[in-house]
């Protein structure tokens, strides 16, 4: 897909920078140079998708395949709502500016990046496929891909997202003996899976204390914790007791809390569990710390986006706070003021799959073009 994006940028007459992040994964940066003297604006979007479409539960759904089709004014296909539709809007916004002969003072760039999806390497899950959480944008900003401001076209229902939560991933483990079933009589309570039952009950007691803590709230939204996975034993060899069982949590952290503080707090909880169940061999590991991001309501980018949205839709856009992660996490830490603003997340259709309304894409592209004029200034 990166190759297709590069070809598109070349056809548009953009200055193109190919960033080979690793084998099989690249960022593509297209730059429309300005006349000088104006702020620069980046449109950032990720090339990777949440799914491949080959998953058994998706393989039969046409809208989750990498083959587009149009039906009833809606465009279907893998990744259209998250967020390949936004990438198309960026391209058409710059094409519209070129067709209209609009020259801007500041540079406008489109950054098509890899490795944004919320996933990471852990255990046997190793390799490029599992390197996410802004891996591409982290490479981008350290290799020349910087601007004064950035619009991220994540699916926000055309709302201006002034901030989003970060994510902390935690592993909690229990241990037990590894013995043959025949010799396990009287030792069921030592089984690491059985021991994890105590831990899970205690974690479920702890979760509301995290979610209800005012310190963990942001912009009217509460924090949230997902009990995401449990791994223990060997399905191919259940003649042995499991020597270790792992529980995995996704703990959402407000952008106002330092990740080091969040890490300290969740590990204190784990230490409490170890003290409560000393025979369980409990240990904890924090293996993702992806901070949230925010932008001030009075930042010039918000004013520029408000004006553009109002011109297209006839009303000021609503505000929102989300608990999903975006590459704003990295961009803001490089001094790039970043806001999430994009299309609908799509009409939920479990039969036909991922989709977006074409008219909505056209209007969003116009908002982006007008926002670029407002930010970068017409020469």
Task: Enumerate the predicted regions with their spans.
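Metal-dependent amide/peptide-bond hydrolase catalytic core
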Residues: 1, 17, 171-379
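N-terminal helical capping/dimerization or prosegment-like subdomains
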Residues: 1-59, 244-248, 262-268
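Short acidic loop-to-helix transition motifs that present clustered carboxylates
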Residues: 22-27, 157, 324-327
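Active-site metal-coordination/substrate-binding segment of hydrolases
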Residues: 38-112, 118-120, 352
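Short beta-strand segments
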Residues: 44-46, 111-113, 151-154, 173, ...
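Acidic-glycine-rich active-site phosphate/pyrophosphate-binding loop
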Residues: 54-71, 163-174, 304-308, 339
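Acidic/histidine-rich catalytic neighborhood of metal-dependent amide-processing enzymes
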Residues: 83-165
């Amino acid at each position: 897909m990166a190759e297709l994006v590069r070809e598109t940028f070349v056809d548009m007459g953009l200055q193109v920078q190919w960033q080979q992040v690793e084998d099989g994964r690249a960022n593509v940066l297209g730059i429309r140079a300005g006349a000088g003297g104006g702020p620069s604006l980046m449109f950032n979007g990720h090339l990777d998708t949440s799914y491949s479409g080959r998953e058994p539960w998706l393989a039969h759904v046409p809208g989750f395949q990498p083959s587009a089709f149009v039906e009833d004014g809606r465009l279907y296909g893998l990744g259209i709502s998250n967020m390949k539709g936004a990438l198309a809007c960026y391209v058409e916004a710059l094409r519209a500016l070129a067709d209209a002969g609009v020259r801007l003072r500041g540079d406008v760039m489109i950054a098509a990046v890899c490795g944004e999806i919320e996933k990471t390497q852990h255990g046997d899950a190793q390799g490029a496929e599992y390197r996410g959480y802004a891996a591409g944008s982290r490479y981008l900003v350290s290799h020349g891909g910087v601007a004064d401001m950035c619009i991220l076209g994540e699916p926000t229902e055309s709302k201006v997202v002034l901030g989003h939560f970060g994510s902390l991933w935690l592993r909690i483990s229990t241990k037990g003996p590894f013995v043959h079933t025949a010799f396990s009589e009287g030792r069921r309570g030592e089984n690491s899976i059985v021991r994890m039952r105590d831990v899970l009950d205690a974690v479920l007691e702890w979760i509301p204390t995290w979610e209800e803590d005012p310190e963990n709230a942001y912009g009217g939204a509460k924090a949230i914790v997902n009990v995401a996975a449990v791994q223990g034993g060997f399905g191919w060899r259940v003649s042995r007791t499991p020597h270790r069982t792992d529980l995995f949590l996704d703990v959402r952290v407000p952008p106002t809390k330092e990740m080091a503080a969040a890490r300290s707090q969740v590990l204190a909880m784990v230490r409490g569990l170890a003290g409560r169940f000393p025979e369980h061999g409990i240990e904890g590991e924090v293996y993702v710390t992806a901070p949230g991001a925010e932008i001030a309501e009075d930042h010039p980018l918000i004013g520029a986006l408000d004006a553009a949205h109002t011109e297209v839709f006839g009303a000021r856009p609503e505000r929102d706070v989300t608990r999903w992660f975006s590459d704003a996490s990295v961009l803001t830490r490089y001094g790039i003021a970043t806001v999430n603003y994009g299309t609908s997340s799509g009409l939920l259709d479990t039969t036909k799959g991922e989709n977006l309304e074409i008219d909505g894409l056209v209007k969003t592209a116009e908002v982006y073009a007008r926002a670029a004029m407002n930010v970068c200034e017409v020469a």
